[in-house]
Amino acid sequence: MVSRCSCLGVQCLLLSLLLLAAWEVGSGQLHYSVYEEARHGTFVGRIAQDLGLELAELVQRLFRVASKRHGDLLEVNLQNGILFVNSRIDREELCGRSVECSIHLEVIVDRPLQVFHVDVEVKDINDNPPRFSVTEQKLSIPESRLLDSRFPLEGASDADVGENALLTYKLSPNEYFVLDIINKKDKDKFPVLVLRKLLDREENPQLKLLLTATDGGKPEFTGSVSLLILVLDANDNAPIFDRPVYEVKMYENQVNQTLVIRLNASDSDEGINKEMMYSFSSLVPPTIRRKFWINERTGEIKVNDAIDFEDSNTYEIHVDVTDKGNPPMVGHCTVLVELLDENDNSPEVIVTSLSLPVKEDAQVGTVIALISVSDHDSGANGQVTCSLTPHVPFKLVSTYKNYYSLVLDSALDRERVSAYELVVTARDGGSPPLWATASVSVEVADVNDNAPAFAQSEYTVFVKENNPPGCHIFTVSAWDADAQENALVSYSLVERRLGERSLSSYVSVHAESGKVYALQPLDHEELELLQFQVSARDGGVPPLGSNLTLQVFVLDENDNAPALLASPAGSAGGAVSELVLRSVVAGHVVAKVRAVDADSGYNAWLSYELQSAAVGARIPFRVGLYTGEISTTRALDETDSPRQRLLVLVKDHGEPSLTATATVLVSLVEGSQAPKASSRASVGVAPEVALVDVNVYLIIAICAVSSLLVLTLLLYTALRCSAAPTEGACGPVKPTLVCSSAVGSWSYSQQRRQRVCSGEGLPKADLMAFSPSLPPCPMVDVDGEDQSIGGDHSRKPRQPNPDWRYSASLRAGMHSSVHLEEAGILRAGPGGPDQQWPTVSSATPEPEAGEVSPPVGAGVNSNSWTFKYGPGNPKQSGPGELPDKFIIPGSPAIISIRQEPTNSQIDKSDFITFGKKEETKKKKKKKKGNKTQEKKEKGNSTTDNSDQ
């Protein structure tokens, strides 16, 4: 039966231990114990193992032990994770008389941040013997004292606690006194002598006794004091207090001289034996004597020094009252003073283990810091709550009593707020409450979350051609909202190919400054638009970037001189020979000088001047300012030299202007010499010279050949129109169009082909928009002859469609004016310049005054008009004012619109080509008689067809 009960007891004990261990793990605390005075290196516990930490990670995770006041008493060996005694532990010095004594440790590890709480109980050993405050106590006892009279003695004190401080007293054997033990509230004991036999001073005037105190430790320690009892003569009544124990409650922090209590004692004797004096007992320690004092006459106890609840909350004061009898008699009482707590201590805030700086992409819930708070007050005055600065992306989370974690509550953005100054406020529960604050500076570390940004996504730059190599043409700049290396922006070209060359052969960009340089001279005639992208990348990992589109327009400069074109009468740049009848009238066209300029705009606008070969010579010829046509100014006579050498100066309108000189040799012949001269002259003889005595068979042969040629051209045109055009990326485009309308034929020819390639998408052909009111027209090849559609449409003029508009690409750069010969007028209106078109043909005799014709070198004749680049739309021409031709800027294409009479002839020699020779055919008609010839000259006009 006993064995079974023993087993049940062991099981209960084990179950209790398991529950206690589970509670400790759940609460996050470890408990160890160690005896005081243990030697250095004494084993306390395997703290790393008990906390579930690996030995290999103790150093990596910065394992450390912290204690507020006793940090050097215990230490942890990081090699084996054992907690050991580091220095001498004296329990009496550490905790005094407190029953419970422990050392509170905080174990902190990082990565992740964790805090563990460890309590090490310091156990007492019996290392202190009982001690009396004096070696001898004197007692004066009147002989008249009655039996069982009690006389308190000063007890011994033991610095140990528990069983080691439990004292037992023993009195040396005698016949008069016995020893009685009184237990106090704090479990202390003090001895009392009890009179068992009446004293007789005459028999024994004094007694010597020995009081011995023994503690409960093992081994036992003892202490003793001598008792000297003086037997006095009779003062029969001792003073008596109202009650033996007085209890007083008062608040701490009372000012000096504050009354604690007024004691009252009485003595039944008379006279001097009734007079009493109050005093502190010899049992009162000096600490209490410093804080309180007693008025020996009135018995008032007052505050003498600061009394603090946090130092001690109770005071036990022993008071004696002594009469003035002889011998004097003494009465005893005890005053218990209990202090009430006041809220006189502000909380304390300690911030430890900061994990700074915090990356702006840190996850919500990341622990930033640990915060501990404390308050020396008690009760509600010592209950502390923490709060944080409002409107911040952080919060406080309570992890343990008086411990908080500062964690991330919402996402951070360094570009919006780069640092936070947090204020942690700890407030107690007193009334009024007290508080304390602590500042926490949280710096937000940057991550690469912003790409470089340009102010605009696209820029347009205008650069003149023939720039020096390495010329700075533009500077790109991007801004990155990040910091440090994440904000370091570098620039580079987005490489691609332009035809057969790479983009980097044209331009480069400085990686740091963003300056864009032209690596070689740009040529407007070769490349009019250079479009590319510049990339900006930051220095982050991974890098972020963005692109900028840069459009570089190459502006034309006058770097090409006019070039003379070859004519049937002579080679290009050489002398041209022409035969002229002396019978021609004024205004007769003798020859035409053709020139071309590779530039564009005003730089390609050519004008012609006639220079005399001989100084002072009177020349009966003039040259059209813009047409290059050499005509007679008067009727020729016999005084004119039979051979005229004409020098024609061709110059453009650039700054400075460039020139070329053409030489025309004119031979004046009589009508009878014309056939002979024609056999020696070139094929450039004017078509107006009558062919006399031509064989009828020759005329039939010419007509047959001409008919065959016309049929061949028609068949060729039909085949070309039926073939589908093909276009390649960035390749040459052939915009072809021939239309016939009520006002004449519209022809489009292309000789000099240019293109603008952006590298993105297919190349765009020249755009031509026509009024839908015009009749449909067939398409022919650019290299073919002009075709016109006959019918009634050529006789019925129609109003141009007002919906015709310029393309947006044609309103970007340079512009030309409308040049009208004779009656040309340029008027400014609200919608832009108005063009008024002349009603005369190019065969109308020119006045003696200067001409206002457009530049022939630019591909515009006297009855043509040009587009204007500008923001406004030009005013539409009225009925009958449709222009003969127009130029599409940026392209060599010229659209010719000419109203031809039914009997008009097209002079193929008037076609002008840019960079390509076009075959010229002249049709000669035989006419009889000079009079008939003059009438035909006045009635017919030669129409110039312009080419590009």
UniProtKB/Swiss-Prot annotation:
Cadherin domain segment(s): 29-132, 133-241, 242-349, 350-454, 455-564, 587-689
InterPro entries noted in UniProt: Cadherin-like_dom, Cadherin-like_sf, Cadherin_CBD, Cadherin_CS, Cadherin_N, Protocadherin/Cadherin-CA
Species lineage: Eukaryota, Metazoa, Chordata, Craniata, Vertebrata
GO CC annotation: cell-cell contact zone; extracellular region; plasma membrane
Membrane side Extracellular: residue ranges: 29-695
Organism: Homo sapiens
Region (6 X 4 AA repeats of P-X-X-P): 732-892
Highest taxon above the source species: Eukaryota
Descriptive protein name: Protocadherin alpha-10
